Amino acid sequence: MKVAVLGFGTVGAGIYEMLANAKGLEQGPVLVRPGKDDAPFKRTSMEAILAEPGVEAVAEAMGGIEPAFSYAMAALKAGKHFVTSNKALVAAHGIELAAAAREKGVGFLFSAACGGGMPFLHNLSIAVESDLIVSLGGILNGTTNYMLDAMQRRSLGYAEALSDAQRLGYAEADPSADVSGLDALRKIVLSAAVAYDLLPVEGLCHEGIESITAEDVKRIQARGLSCRLMAKCGPAAGGKVYAYVEPVLFPASAPECSVLDLSLIHI
């Protein structure tokens, strides 16, 4: 199967390299911005990508909602499988994209958007075939988890913990989606879509860690507790689904507190 790649940044280049050694897959054309010369087999329009002979799948590595959404719809309507790790795209337009994929009988795959290297969404999609999911949630953002742990174990202030996370590559140059809880909210929304075949879009609440200070941490620890940013979703009245993200206090011995810079998901 020949796979086209949209974008040739760190993620796109990594996908292209992986395709060279993946059994049953073949490197296809790469969509890049005009003037970007370092991409192999490059094309500068989605029309050229879709017209390329033999392309059966498209892997999106651009990020953001547009033009990723327009490109995704074009690929699906052209009968191409579409793969993405773009949680913002899926959270905003997942229902439309899934419907377009079903109409054409192709795959719309987004497991990489939640859980990092864990095949969480794939396994969840299998579980819902035979089990009722009463609720699910957990620690879905490694950046904030690292920061909270640094503030608690190493007595760093918020700004110091954020700077440390950026230096080590946990946090991006613009960490706002992470620290505000928006990244975790997008991931729990995707999880809810798989678990309940419904996107919770109304009245979603997310509280991040920006307001947590070193003094807060001292008071929390004095009570034998520890803080983690938790996401949760489940069925609600009226056939709806709830989803939220907020800091939660746990006993310091709780399993959640042993997770330092990774994710933890419970169903």
Task: Describe the predicted segments one by one.
Residues M46-A57, A61, I65-S85:
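Rossmann-fold NAD(P) dinucleotide-binding segment
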Residues K87-F108, L121-L124:
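Rossmann-fold NAD(P)-binding glycine/threonine-rich loop
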Residues I126-R186:
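Conserved anion/nucleotide-ligand pocket segment
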Residues L162-P255:
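Substrate-binding/catalytic subdomain of NAD(P)-dependent oxidoreductase enzymes
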Residues I265-I267:
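Conserved small/polar residues in nucleotide/adenosyl-binding loops
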